[in-house]
């Protein structure tokens, strides 16, 4: 396995986007994970999609100028998980979510990207869980078809608060939708005290990977406090033939204690660890 390292542009929200990309390039990453997070990242879909082609070409140029590949485009349609969830019970909301996804496919294609991540949806308290799940499968299947039609791989991030919040539910969801894969982030499971060995089988279902420190009770922790065995993760990736990027993804937001570590230092520490242990992978 040739280790390909990316870094999230949304790891450094206090910098301008240009300076964030400068920093990622200075740190020697191969690629950048680009966040399209409505209301809370450098790049908002509502601001980009008005002149989509121009916005996409501008981003592609910035990445190229810095020698960075576009590792992933990560769509989040709203600051919360619910209001524009892909499996929302309201048909009009689902149509809005589909339109945003279609535009993201177009944007990614214009940028020269090959991978899109998004959130899977939630379980709605107003209906049986099975209805939320059935609608989720339908919506994700539609997205897989739209992305695959343009040569793009589509993946969901199984996250805290989602309809796929455990390794078992995440695996079941991915396996139930043809063409679907995972943007795998151990930390969303580690936070709940789930052991690495329970998460590890998901690597075989992943097309993208997020890495940062975590421990029980903390979605994001320092490298010193981290309990995830990333050396074993890299070895498992080699065994299963993983070919995607490993994205170092520290975030700085006032949610789940995710503003309590030094993102720059932690990014460097984890980058160096991954390079050391991935050299022979």
Task: Please place each PLM-identified region on the residue numbering.
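A short acidic, helix-capping loop that chelates divalent metal ions and anchors anionic groups
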Residues: 40-45, 80-87, 124-129, 193, ...
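Histidine-acidic metal/acid-base catalytic patches
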Residues: 1-6, 14-30, 58, 64, ...
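Residue-level preference for long, well-ordered alpha-helices that form the structural scaffold
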Residues: 13, 48-55, 90-97, 129-132, ...
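Active-site acidic/histidine proton-transfer and metal-coordination neighborhood
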Residues: 64-65, 80-181, 191, 264-267
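Active-site-proximal loop/turn and secondary-structure-junction residues that shape catalytic pockets
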Residues: 11, 36-38, 76-79, 120-124, ...
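Short beta-strand segments at enzyme active-site cores
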Residues: 33-34, 70-75, 113-120, 154-157, ...
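Glycine-rich, proline-tolerant flexible connector loops at the mouths of alpha/beta enzymes
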Residues: 35-60, 120-127
């Amino acid at each position: 396995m040739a280790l390909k390292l990316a870094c999230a542009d949304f790891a450094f929200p206090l910098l301008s986007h240009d300076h964030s990309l400068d920093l990622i390039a200075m740190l020697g990453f191969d690629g950048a994970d680009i966040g399209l997070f409505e209301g809370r990242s450098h790049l908002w879909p509502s601001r980009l999609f008005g002149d989509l082609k121009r916005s996409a070409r501008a981003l592609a140029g910035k990445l190229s100028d810095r020698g960075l590949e576009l590792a992933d485009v990560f769509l989040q349609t709203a600051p919360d998980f619910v209001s524009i969830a892909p499996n929302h019970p309201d048909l009009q909301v689902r149509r809005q979510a589909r339109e945003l996804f279609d535009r993201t496919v177009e944007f990614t294609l214009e940028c020269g990207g090959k991978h899109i991540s998004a959130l899977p949806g939630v379980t709605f308290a107003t209906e049986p869980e099975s209805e939320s799940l059935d609608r989720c499968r339908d919506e994700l299947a539609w997205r897989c078809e739209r992305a695959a039609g343009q040569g793009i791989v589509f993946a969901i991030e199984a996250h805290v608060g989602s309809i796929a919040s455990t390794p078992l539910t995440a695996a079941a969801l991915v396996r139930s939708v043809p063409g679907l894969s995972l943007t795998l982030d151990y930390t969303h499971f580690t936070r709940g005290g789930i052991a690495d060995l329970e998460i590890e089988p998901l690597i075989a279902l992943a097309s993208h990977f997020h890495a940062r420190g975590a421990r029980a009770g903390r979605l994001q922790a320092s490298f010193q406090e981290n309990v995830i065995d990333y050396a074993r993760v890299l070895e498992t990736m080699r065994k299963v033939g993983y070919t995607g990027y490993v994205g170092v993804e520290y975030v700085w937001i006032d949610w789940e204690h995710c503003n309590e570590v030094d993102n720059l230092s932690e990014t460097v520490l984890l980058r160096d660890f991954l390079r050391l242990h991935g050299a022979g992978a």
